[in-house]
Structures are given as C-alpha cells and as structure tokens.
Amino acid sequence: FFYKKNLEEKYLKNWKDLQPKTVQLLNYFNQNVGQYPYKQYSVIQGGDGGMEYAMATLITGKRKFGSLFGVTAHEMAHTWFQFLLATNESLHPWMDEGFTSYISNKAENEILKEGKVNPHEGSYRGYRTIVERGYEESLATHSDRYDTNWAYGTASYSKGNLFLSQL
C-alpha cells in the first residue's frame, strides 16, 4: 500500500481499513475466479478515479470507505477480466468492464456483508432506464464508436454484468 500519510484523518483511516479488506478481496477472487499469478499486488494513491494495471491499482485518496473499497475491488478484478483472460477492452468493453463489475459486486456484497439478495440490482436499473429512453446500443459496438458515453457505460458495465448474472 502506498498513500499519502498527510491525508485528513478520516481518509487516512479509510486507507488503513482497506488493507485487510484487500487481502479478503484477493482471497475471494482466487477462490471464485482463479489464482492470482504474481507475487504482489499494490494499491497506490494516485491518478484520477481508479485505474487498473496487472499488478496494481491507482486510486484517488479522498474517498469514503465504501467508495474506496468498491473502486479497489473493481480495479483489482481487472487482473482476471482483462489481463489474464486477455479480453480486448476496446473491441469488447462489455467483457472487460461487465465481467469485472459482476465479480466485484459479488465480492463487495460478501466481504462487506451487505446482505443484498441481488448485488447487480443497480445494473438492472441502469439497463432498464437506457432501454426505456431509447438509447441502448449493441454490445458489438467498438468502445470508441458509441454515440454517447451513457450508452458506452451502460453497455460495458451494466449489460456485460447482466450477461453473466443471467447464466
């Protein structure tokens, strides 16, 4: 873990609390997806939002714990659903982001003991809304060819997630 030690106390606490939860995340993914093949995984405060790399996550520092955990879970899951599975995130963003959303939602629900009957409920809501408003686009659309960011986000994160949840 690498984060600024001069963060406000509330954010510093969140980063400290994240450390044992990150171990739980790695164990969850190892048990439910496959073994992590590298010797270490790093969570680093930096960047804008969250960004995945094969052995690291960069994430902004000033976050509430739930947000910090959720982004860490999602970005860490990309180790399997992009890097190890070798999906082409430009050609098939729904596999990259959707599969990652699926497993990170399940991990978050279990590790944080959220008790949700359906941890993918937000994806169902988002998908339903875009369909009702007539903005849905095909999953076969290349990531930089969507008409709107909304259509890209819903297809990639929500619709890809729902694909797995329906299996």
What are these regions (language model features)?
Residues 1-93, 103, 107, 146-150:
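Juxtacatalytic substrate-recognition/specificity segment
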Residues 68, 164-167:
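Generic hydrophobic alpha-helical segments
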Residues 91, 97-165:
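Acidic/His/Gly-enriched intrinsically disordered linker/tail segments
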